[in-house]
Amino acid sequence: MSPGLSYRLGRIFGQDGRTMILPIDHGLIGGRVHGLENPRALLDVAIGLGCDGFLMSQGMAQQTAQMFGHRDAPVRVLTVDSLYGARDQDPGSAALVASVETAVRLGLDAVKLLMPWDVPSAQQAATAERIAGVVKLATAWEMPVMVEPIAMRLPQGPEAVEVECHASRIAMELGADIIKVGYPGNVTIMKSLCDELGVPVVILGGPGTGTVTGLLRMVGDALAGGASGIVIGRKVWQQDQRIWTSLAKALVRMVHGGLTTDEAIDVLEAAG
């Protein structure tokens, strides 16, 4: 592993090999997003909660650069692509909206791309080509690449899990340094996927639905299955204002501090 890549991955993942990243890049695709009406104010609070880092757009990285201009600043991962129009039978259209060079210039620690895979083969080929191009540039700059394989249109279930696991393997083969993917539903599949890929696997949260208890149980199971951490945004900051900061702290303690699922549930019940 090159020195620059090793250094940046060492910032993203703690000595325990884990990370807790809070995404705030949703406005890049969704525009106005509930819970993220003032991302700068949210970030100002979130920085003090113990999160290892944040996933953000180029514009947000530029606007909040001063928040990270100190020695112990959290890491930042730059979202370099976006997807528009994906709904029902429309696979949508994806495009690069930032670059590896932008991440280097702004002092970020990694770049992230989407990998929608329940799409026509021509779009799969274009996606693979786009990821390979970013990986090539990132390798030259020794910049880690996070890839997010996702079934955009399939309902949650075994078929979507199969698509995302299949795409995760392809992402690794394309050179991804980190795979961000949905929890596959049970610890056995999670462990098998982590063993197969051989690169850190971090779990996304998905749409801001479901219960806090369900989220905590999912995170606990994912970590038990070998996940190297979580990259969860909406299911945290779309909670009630009284809850989301306590939830973020509890997730940090689950990832790094050995807090069990049941203990985390107790913490949140006390906070509520």
Task: Show the residue positions of the predicted features.
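N-terminal basic/disordered segments at the start of proteins
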Residues: 1-14
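Thr-Gly-centered strand-to-loop micro-motif
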Residues: 204-205, 232
